[in-house]
């Protein structure tokens, strides 16, 4: 897990996103323990409450779960859950915006496909 904080997104959200990325890349696998609040807060010199807030986002979404007295673990099926969540966000954030801009510029679907094929 690697974190390089930016000012435009709250740190607790960046922590949650970094853990999500690590799950998607299978750095953290399902039913595996993730670094503790203390480990992350010490390593990145941030408040443990901020780390806990990021963890709580993921617990609420069912991505990770807590084993009392042991630590936080990646939930079964979390990779698929995150893939679906990210695909939906990608569609809303990028595809819809692309289609709206293409419509304004009178770019056909065929032209969009040609542009994409040229870049891939």
Task: Outline where the language-model segments fall.
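Short, cationic-aromatic polyanion-contact patches
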Residues: 12, 16, 36, 72-87
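The DNA-recognition helices of helix-turn-helix-type DNA-binding domains
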Residues: 58, 119-120
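N-terminal helix-turn-helix
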Residues: 33-65
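Short hydrophobic/aromatic-rich motifs at helix boundaries and adjacent loops
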Residues: 8-9, 26-27, 42, 69-72, ...
